Amino acid sequence: MNGLFVSFEGVDGVGKTTQVERLRAYLEAQGRTVVVTREPGGTALGKAIRQLLLHGVDGGAVDIAPRAEALLFAADRAQHVAETIRPALERGEVVITDRYLDSSLAYQAGGRELTPEEIRSLSMWATNNLLPDRTYLLDMDPALSHHRLEHAEDRMESAGDDFQSRTRQAFLDLAAAEPNRFRVIDASQSIEAVWAAIESDIKELA
């Protein structure tokens, strides 16, 4: 059986984690072996990088330069693909990741003013050109999604409304550029309605 690689994208608070778990349960009920992971932080090295990216050094705020931030995300992604994603796909398993390279393109190129070409080139090099078979973009106005967050804001979430709006638009632009890979779903709907859209689509792939 062929491996299947699925990613979930969107600004914070749109409900990605809930839908990742729904999809995991559905596919496991179909008899598939499923690996659920996330970026940043899908490996031991990635967890250390995630802590640095989201919470700074020793819990203290740090202003990470945009190019340094891009390289940290790329390092996490390179390890993630080599250690977790590619081996699982080669075993014929399903990999579901909460964020992948599109987050770098949206948050760093769209939100932090690096060029998309720079970020995409770096990301594709880090992953050895591995793209998901399907990417679900859960789309919602950041002003609404922000109210859903139930934890203290990390460095990315506290970047401000303009940043989040630019990031949302960057995600939508990415989806428009790759319509065969992306499915854009209105995440302001109920959890059940969002899941129904995913379930209908995944049947074509799994």
Curated annotation (Swiss-Prot):
Catalytic activity: dTMP + ATP = dTDP + ADP
Protein's GO biological process: dTDP biosynthetic process; dTTP biosynthetic process; dUDP biosynthetic process
Keyword tags: ATP-binding, Kinase, Nucleotide biosynthesis, Nucleotide-binding, Transferase
One Pfam assignment: Thymidylate_kin
Origin: domain of life: Bacteria
Binding site for ATP: G10, V11, D12, G13, V14, G15, K16, T17
EC id: 2.7.4.9
EC class (word): transferase
A cellular component annotation (GO) from this entry: cytosol
Family recorded in the similarity comment: Belongs to the thymidylate kinase family.
Role: Phosphorylation of dTMP to form dTDP in both de novo and salvage pathways of dTTP synthesis.
Protein name listed in UniProt: Thymidylate kinase
UniProt source species: Bifidobacterium longum (strain NCC 2705)
